[in-house]
């Protein structure tokens, strides 16, 4: 459950380390973002000499949340951190590698490129 002002770790090699959510996209007044939702965020911590710099506004898709996700078959999926992957306007990841597991719900949200780059899909 991500809301504005929430901090997320970045799960790719785009150059950002942490981003802060400033808006959840999809709907006029959407309050919370879940796995597979697109957000607008600002880079709060970045690696030096990389493409993304601090205070840059970016789009990202949420790939892991601490809030549990209930599936139709009754299983509950919960992660240890809130994490996102930075994407461009077309929805493709800006980095070339994804770190850590991602949820299967990203495939249903049409982020197949992120799912194919991920080392593990839960």
From Swiss-Prot:
Annotated GO biological process: translation
Question: In which compartments does the protein localize?
Answer: Plastid, Chloroplast
The question of whether NAD is a record keyword is answered with no
InterPro entries in alphabetical order: Ribosomal_uL14 (IPR000218), Ribosomal_uL14_bac-type (IPR005745), Ribosomal_uL14_CS (IPR019972), Ribosomal_uL14_sf (IPR036853)
Q: Which UniProt keywords apply?
A: Chloroplast, Plastid, Ribonucleoprotein, Ribosomal protein, RNA-binding, rRNA-binding
Show the GO cellular component annotation of the record.
chloroplast; cytosolic large ribosomal subunit
A single GO molecular function term of this UniProt record: large ribosomal subunit rRNA binding
Matching CDD domains: Ribosomal_uL14 (cd00337)
Q: Which PANTHER family match?
A: 50S/60S RIBOSOMAL PROTEIN L14/L23, LARGE RIBOSOMAL SUBUNIT PROTEIN UL14M
Q: Which proteins does it associate with, and in what oligomeric form?
A: Part of the 50S ribosomal subunit.
What does the UniProt record say this protein does?
Binds to 23S rRNA.
Family per similarity comment:
Belongs to the universal ribosomal protein uL14 family.
Specify the protein name: Large ribosomal subunit protein uL14c
Chain's gene name: rpl14
